[in-house]
A protein has these predicted regions:
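Conserved histidines in hydrophobic membrane contexts and catalytic metal-binding motifs
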Residues: 1-381
């Protein structure tokens, strides 16, 4: 039996090994993207001095709106519970566009721009730097990443069978990484012991990652949890920022900035009631992580373990600011919840900093497994 699995392990690893290394390494580089960006651009994400009270949220939105061209609108404002963090004002375009504003002075600190390094790592991780074909042709990069990830699952499972020790002594020895007995021994120990230590996390990351590659897999994966897949965005699995940006089409149609033709037709500012909504949601949710308010809707997210994209959603009257409805995360549809859980488990954020560090290390070890495997295989030829 082990002989068969050894052949499966080898002949799946040889053609897909380098792809697995690229996928794992690029994934590891993305784990702490936010922390790296905030460390390198602290002046963008944090205010210089915390004032006695922030400006009204509507005032902040109007200050940004006054600087925008007629084709771009303010879609929402995200306020963190940390008073030293700058507010994020989301824009209608381009996709995911936003600027950071000092909520105490109204100073526009700068525009959010994803660093080229992380953009490259993301595209490498998801699509091997390929792009979706405008004519709807085969998305080869996405397909290759998905296929390599699926093969990685079989490689990991076959690796368990090959490794499985017969005695306790063999088990103890196989879980040691010795560094003083030559390069070959080190590579062997790293491949065997490293693979076993990270096995569960690598399997979890691979199995959740496949849901973004193949629709048939996503459908089956959801059904395992008794959930039917739904079309559309992240629902309650989406972050507050994503949810806010989801309202950009409605915001754009209604003229999400004062001035221009909309102002001439209707003197009502879409930002008038935002401060009232913000204050009420803060009072209702004292343990909030961030609150995002946009036209007629708002989301509240929390700093809790588990689904890091969990959020309560509210609707309100844009003129009066009266809360007209609420859909709490605990009452949300299961498909929205599982989307957020898949993301949180895949990136390791579900358990806070500890699980993120473990996922980062596991991904790095996963990137090394094909390389050490190639080395050991070539030495045997």
């Amino acid at each position: 039996m082990k002989k068969v699995f050894r052949k499966i392990h080898l002949w799946l690893s040889v053609p897909f090994g380098l792809l697995i290394t690229l996928i794992c390494f690029s994934g590891a580089m993305l784990v702490f993207e936010t922390e790296v960006m905030e460390l390198c651009h602290r002046d963008l994400y944090y205010v210089e001095k915390v004032g006695p009270a922030p400006l009204p949220m509507g005032k902040v939105a109007e200050k940004v709106a006054a600087t925008l061209p007629d084709s771009v609108f303010v879609t929402g404002v995200t306020a963190s519970s940390a008073p030293e963090r700058a507010w994020q004002v989301n824009l209608s375009k381009p996709r995911r566009a936003s600027v950071y504003v000092d909520q105490y002075t109204g100073e526009i600190k700068g525009k959010y721009e994803r660093a080229p390094f992380f953009t490259t790592m993301f595209r490498l991780h998801r699509w091997l730097l390929d792009s979706m074909k405008p004519d709807g042709g085969i998305f080869w990069g996405k397909m290759i990443v998905g296929t390599a990830t699926l093969m990685f699952v079989f490689v990991l499972i076959s690796g368990i069978v090959i490794w499985w020790p017969r005695t306790k002594k063999a088990l103890k020895n196989s879980l040691k990484i010795v560094s003083g007995k030559g390069w070959r021994r080190f590579c062997y120990d790293l491949h065997v012991a490293g693979g076993m230590y990270t096995l569960v996390l690598l399997l979890v990351m691979a199995l959740t990652g496949l849901s973004w590659s193949f629709s048939w897999y996503r459908t089956g994966f959801y059904k395992v949890f008794g959930v039917e897949t739904t079309q559309g965005g992240g629902g309650h699995g989406a972050s507050a920022q994503t949810a806010a940006q989801g309202g950009e089409r409605a915001q754009g149609r209604s003229g999400g900035r004062p001035g221009g033709e909309h102002r001439e037709r209707n003197s009502f500012s879409p930002f008038t009631s935002w401060q009232k909504v913000y204050e009420e949601l803060k009072e209702l949710n004292p343990d909030y992580k961030q609150i995002t308010v946009f036209k007629g809707s708002a989301t509240v997210s929390f700093n809790r373990l588990g689904n890091q994209r969990a959020a309560d959603r509210y609707t309100f009257n844009p003129r009066s600011g009266e809360i007209t409805g609420a859909t709490l995360y605990k009452d949300a549809d299961a498909s929205g919840k599982i989307r957020g859980w898949i993301f949180s488990v895949h990136v390791g954020s579900w358990g806070g900093l500890t699980t993120r560090i473990l996922s980062f290390l596991a991904a790095l070890v996963g990137a090394s497994l094909p390389l050490t495997g190639y080395y050991l295989w070539i030495r045997r030829l």
